[in-house]
Amino acid sequence: MENGIKESPVGLNKNGALAILPTPLVSEGHKNHKSVLNSLTSGALAGAVAKTAVAPLDRTKIIFQVSSNRFSAKEAYRLIYRTYMNDGFLSLWRGNSATMVRVIPYAAIQFCAHEQYKKLLGSYYGFQGSALTPIPRLLAGALAGTTATLLTYPLDLVRARMAVTQKEMYSNIIHVFMRMSREEGLKSLYRGFTPTVLGVIPYAGISFFTYETLKKLHAEHSGRTQPYTFERLLFGACAGLFGQSSSYPLDVVRRRMQTAGVTGHTYGSIIGTMQEIVAEEGFIRGLYKGLSMNWVKGPVAVGISFTTFDLTQILLKKLQQISHIQR
């Protein structure tokens, strides 16, 4: 086992003579099953840790995004301070339970889908066992984000509603679903879906592309196959910065459309929403409201997310190897 040579079992054949029996191999299906489970587990943990770390900043950003009030770092600080003084420290994480209900499946699906799309595209383009070229690398990230968004979108909408409303309006996640379905119709659960997907495609594509590219360049120049933890955090931070900056206006639009039912506005389309925001608040102040906060929140969250995923993947693989050796 330790020298890398697999010993084949010896037994008797049908004639009674000694013969080498075929070695029982782990099926490809079993390997893929373990790989998928590892990716789902690592992705779920990565999403939960990252989002919890930046939840107060995320909630503050959403509140500014869905209002016409001018954003500034000073006003953001005042909002956080007022929330803390009026409602207590834990109120800064209001809506985080809804966030976890969305983020855990979203991150699990996104990271798992990314691993599967990498294999699929690698097989298609003939890059199996080696790093993908830039276009397939970008495509794998975009497809992963789109898949996760399609499957978990209503949970994102619920999180946005809980973040911008008083506790008395929606008591829990189920209450949000029931009240929206009854008062606004089932279609309301996918309100803002189009700008979300249009924003996710460049965001996820560029984020995964940047992170994978930086890791590849690092391996080529350093001679180390695995970056240190602080290097992973730095690569993830760069990925988050580029990804979120590229899709931010669509993020503002989707938040306005998601929360239209509780803010008194009636946003009907992406173009119409953009025009109304620009007319009322200006192009930069409206469509890029809260971006400076995202330049703090986004890189931190994405850095933690990618790093947690990678390290959890490595840990799970080591545990499985130890378990296999002990057998």
UniProtKB/Swiss-Prot annotation:
Tell me the disulfide pairings in this chain. none
Q: Where are the Solcar repeats?
A: 34-120, 132-217, 227-315
Q: Which residues cross the membrane?
A: 36-56, 92-112, 138-158, 192-209, 233-253, 296-316
Q: Name one GO molecular function term.
A: AMP transmembrane transporter activity
What topology in the membrane does the UniProt record assign?
Multi-pass membrane protein
State the protein's name.
Answer: Mitochondrial coenzyme A transporter SLC25A42
Biological function? Mitochondrial carrier mediating the transport of coenzyme A (CoA) in mitochondria in exchange for intramitochondrial (deoxy)adenine nucleotides and adenosine 3',5'-diphosphate.
Main localization is: mitochondrion
Question: Which is one Gene Ontology cellular component term of this protein?
Answer: mitochondrion
Q: Which PANTHER family does the UniProt entry name for this protein?
A: SOLUTE CARRIER FAMILY 25 (PTHR24089)
